[in-house]
Amino acid sequence: MNASLYQQYVQAKAEHPGKYARDLATLMGISEAELTHSRVGHDAKRLQSDARALLAALESVGEVKAITRNTYAVHEQVGRYENQHLNGHAGLILNPRALDLRLFLNQWASAFTLTEETRHGVRHSIQFFDHQGDALHKVYVTEQTDMSAWEALLAQFIIPENPALQLEPLSTPEAVEPTADDATVDSEWRAMTDVHQFFQLLKRNNLTRQQAFRAVGDDLAYQVDNNSLTQLLHIAQQDQNEIMIFVGNRGCVQIFTGLIEKVTPHNEWINVFNQRFTLHLIETAIAESWITRKPTKDGFVTSLELFAADGTQLAQLYGQRTEGQPEQNQWREQIARLINKDIAA
């Protein structure tokens, strides 16, 4: 099976030389993990699936490029796997303004290392996949990576066999009616003292994020035009205040904090090119753009949240804020410049 899959991959790659493995897998009707599994013995090797141990070992290799993506957005950050807190099912790699990750490790299922020949030379990577076979997180060598430490890590974690992937269909919970009326949701939202309490509010009331947004008053959540992301990135680039950009998937959220250096649209993509950070996001996939205001003990925190038609959250943007400090007035003024969407239209 793997041999024929690999041959299909080689053929698909020859027919579509510019496409990434994720897109080739989609063309082939398989997951990216299945595609990578078929490459073992060619340009891939299987690694032990202990994500915590692998992530901990990555601290030794120094600088790398970390990539976290979903279907519509790709977040690339150069940094180091330092300041790790990987206890329990959730983990943190906490380096604000550098490599800043939130990890949901019960979603991490398999790992591979790849050595790929590309038109830009050889690329070395470690790639992590979830139980559905989707890529959660990828780690690429840079010119500054300690290659002797990288090779030592691989020697420790490569396994000679390539066990079958135990893929599971994504369990989509049946549609459940919200358990609270709009007034209750609004009241509970206003009572929050920490943005992380929002997840508890959603769970308690069987709500999606967008259902909660629609339930509360316009002073807490309202829709804006879907070109708001591009507008806000250009404003932040012009004003040179620090912002935060969150992009995530089921198992990993990657966070950028800093100044925006260059914003470049290209076809359907909006791109941010910084020296150590890159964002690629399919602007045409944005179906809803929401401004939300969540109360904390330090005052309200305002964000722009972007959703695709299938409900996927593409990205979230905040003004840079340190715990214990109020939100930037400049960020609030920038948000206020975005155009309200007339929902009734």
UniProtKB/Swiss-Prot annotation:
CDD domains: HemS-like_C, HemS-like_N
Keywords: Ion transport, Iron, Iron transport, Transport
Listed SUPFAM superfamilies: Heme iron utilization protein-like
Gene3D superfamilies: HemS/ChuS/ChuX like domains
GO terms under biological process: iron ion transport
UniProt keyword Ion transport present: yes
Top-rank taxon, per record: Bacteria
InterPro entries: Heme_Transport_Util_sf, HemS/ChuX_dom
Coiled-coil region(s): none
A Pfam entry, by short name: HemS
The keyword Transport is assigned to this record: yes
Function: Part of the binding-protein-dependent transport system for hemin.
Family: To Y.enterocolitica HemS.
Protein known as: Hemin transport protein HmuS
Organism: Yersinia pestis
Gene that encodes it: hmuS
